[in-house]
Structure formats: structure tokens, C-alpha cells
Design a protein with these regions (language model features):
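Surface-exposed, low-hydrophobicity beta-strand/loop segments enriched in small/polar/acidic residues
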Residues: 1-199
């Protein structure tokens, strides 16, 4: 969407910073997935210093699980194709070595996301919210399946904060704030460049 202060042409808003997915990591990561740094106790196929997908409930698990940003794609040497491939998602296999991935981690960025099955209304603006990690993304398009949960609260370790609703054009899919799965604008809440604690 842009940033809280707008997005002039010279701004880095929406740009992606380089991160790594560990070689042999068995979980797919999709375009648009929320991601965080791996910590002890996570999937043993990854390790410290690498990113891992956000899972619903991570924000309630304590301050050590801190959002990094939004996954925007990756490149890796494919063992099946015998060449470097550029993909909007990581399939959870086929990488011969660590995967170069790109994450928008701009702490001022804002994002449009679907609400859960319960509509997100004006009364929810300013609240904190988690994301559902299921259903998983689409392997044909590589697009994330994540959407907001139905719980809007004051919990400060949750990854996102509701800042606005999409209400136009009237009648468009996602613009009806009385219907579930409407479109919502969120900002990073507990994010690595905003949080005081490290991982």
C-alpha cells in the first residue's frame, strides 16, 4: 500500500531486504506471507539467522517471536532444473543450498489484507491482530493464503495493527465492512525494527 507518511518516488517503501531460508527447510513460504526469524523450538529443518513463516499464535507466545515483514519472493539453485530459478514463493524443497529471499521489512509500510470470517469494522481500527496461517498458499500462483483472525485486541506482541478499512469502490469485493473477509489496511505492530527486544 505504501507508508504511513506516503510514498514519494525516492522512498524505499515497498522495497525488499535480503534474507535467507535455510537449505533443506521443508515448509513452503508464499508471496505475501508474514515471516519472522527462526528461534529455538521452531522447525528443526531451519536454524538461527534464517526466516520462517509466521504461525497463528506466534504473537501470543511471547516477545521472542517478532515479525520481520512480508515475503516477496526468492531465488535458489534448483536441484531438479539444474539452474538458478526466481520464484515468487519457496516450495519447501528443491533448493541445493540456502535460498536468497526478499522481505519488505520497512517498519512504516502498510498492507491490505483480508479480514477473517467476521467482518472488521470501524470499531476495530487501532486494535492489534494476528494472522491465520491456514489455509496455506496456492502452489499454482504462489500467493499467500494468510488472512486476519477474528480477534481484535490490545495485545502488544501481535504482529499487526488495524489502521483503516477499504470501502471503495462501493459494491466491490472486499469493500463491504459488514461482511466477513472484507479488505483491511494494517501496519506492522510488533516488528523487528520497532521492538526493543532481540531474538
Amino acid at each position: 500500500m505504501g507508508t504511513a507518511s506516503g510514498m514519494p518516488n525516492f522512498a524505499r517503501a515497498g522495497s525488499a531486504s535480503p534474507y535467507k531460508i535455510k537449505a533443506g527447510f521443508v515448509t513452503a513460504v508464499y508471496y505475501g506471507d508474514a515471516v519472522r526469524m527462526w528461534i529455538s523450538g521452531d522447525d528443526s529443518s531451519s536454524a538461527a539467522g534464517y526466516i520462517t513463516p509466521w504461525v497463528n499464535g506466534d504473537g501470543a507466545g511471547g516477545a521472542t517471536k517478532i515479525l520481520v515483514g512480508i515475503f516477496l519472493g526468492c531465488s535458489y539453485y534448483s536441484t531438479s532444473q539444474k539452474k538458478t530459478v526466481y520464484n515468487n514463493y519457496y516450495p519447501g524443497s528443491d533448493a541445493a543450498a540456502d535460498v536468497d529471499c526478499y522481505v519488505c521489512d520497512d517498519p512504516q509500510s502498510q498492507w491490505m489484507v483480508q479480514a477473517g470470517s467476521t467482518a472488521c469494522g470501524f470499531a476495530n481500527i487501532g486494535t492489534c491482530v494476528d494472522v491465520e496461517s491456514t489455509p496455506v498458499g496456492n502452489t499454482t500462483t504462489g500467493i499467500s493464503g494468510m488472512h486476519l483472525t477474528n480477534t481484535y485486541t490490545t495485545t502488544n506482541t501481535l504482529p499487526f495493527k488495524v489502521v483503516n478499512l477499504v470501502t471503495s469502490p462501493p459494491g466491490a469485493n472486499g469493500a463491504d465492512i459488514t461482511t466477513g473477509y472484507n479488505n483491511v489496511i494494517v501496519a506492522f505492530n510488533n516488528q523487528q525494527y520497532k521492538a526493543l527486544l532481540g531474538v
